[in-house]
């Protein structure tokens, strides 16, 4: 019979980092975890920023531009038609699996994500707050009716069959780099109920996070012993605000992130490692 080797032990660096995270919390207290794009790059979803925190590509469309211009919506949905399959086919990675396991072990008070891919829930995490919504849903900006993004994808393909065979580089959040094309004839479906504008049910740049989500995160933070940021540069205020609030409450803030972060001076600990590897080490060492 062939022997099955046990999984390798984490390196001393990963082991020490996992222990350092545990040591920051008072006995019996748990982390509120705030995740960003670095948790999902291992699942094949591109991120927005480089290690210096700078944009890798032009900034995403704003809510004002999307709502104010039919041409902008044509360009958005044409690119999304090609980029959506990457999101639809993405599966949870090492970071998602580790955080779900740590939550089951009682290490995590709650999980908040700035990502819109739904992979934390797919990995088995409970009660995830999707701060910026989910790309798998679409909502009418007129009557509020919702539909699944997969349903809209079928509508887009039916109306624009010539676009299906185009190739494009995947971009963050179901976008695709598709330049040099004439989008003026791209047929964008309207809401089947009221004829209104359909928009992904995610928070665009220039759009506020719904207040009930912010309050839900604050309630979790009140109960948590500290805030752990995983895979986020904190360049967006919607996540950064909770770092400031944790510090104001006298709670430690730690981060697992590769690259420059905003407000690093507020961190009690920063681990410049892949968040999936640190999560795996934490599971292995039962810290």
Predicted segments, located by residue:
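Conserved catalytic core of sirtuin-type NAD+-dependent deacylases
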Residues: 1-284
């Amino acid at each position: 019979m062939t022997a099955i080797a046990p999984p390798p032990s984490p390196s001393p660096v990963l082991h020490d980092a996992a222990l350092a995270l545990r040591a920051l919390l008072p006995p019996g207290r748990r982390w509120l975890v705030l995740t960003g794009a670095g948790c999902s790059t291992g699942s094949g979803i591109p991120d927005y920023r480089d290690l210096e925190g700078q944009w890798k590509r032009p900034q995403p469309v704003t809510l004002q531009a999307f709502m104010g211009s039919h041409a902008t919506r044509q360009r958005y949905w044409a690119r999304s038609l090609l980029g959506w399959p990457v999101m639809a086919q993405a599966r949870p990675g090492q970071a998602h699996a580790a955080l779900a396991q740590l939550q089951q072990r009682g290490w995590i008070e709650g999980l908040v994500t700035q990502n819109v891919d739904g992979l934390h829930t797919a990995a088995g995490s409970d009660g995830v707050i999707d701060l910026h919504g989910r790309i798998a849903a679409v909502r009418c900006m007129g009557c509020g009716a919702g539909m699944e993004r997969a349903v809209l994808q079928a509508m887009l393909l039916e109306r624009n069959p010539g676009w299906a065979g185009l190739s494009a580089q995947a971009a963050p959040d179901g976008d695709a780099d598709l330049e040099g094309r004439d989008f003026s004839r791209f047929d964008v479906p309207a809401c089947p109920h009221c004829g209104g504008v359909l928009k992904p049910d995610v928070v665009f740049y220039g759009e506020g996070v719904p207040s009930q989500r912010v309050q839900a995160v604050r309630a979790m933070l009140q109960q948590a012993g500290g805030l752990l940021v995983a895979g986020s540069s904190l360049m967006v205020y919607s996540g950064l605000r909770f770092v400031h609030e944790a510090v104001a409450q006298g709670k430690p803030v730690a981060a697992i992130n590769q690259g420059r972060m905003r407000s690093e001076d507020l961190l009690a600990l920063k681990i410049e490692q892949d968040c999936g590897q640190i999560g795996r080490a934490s599971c292995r060492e039962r810290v």
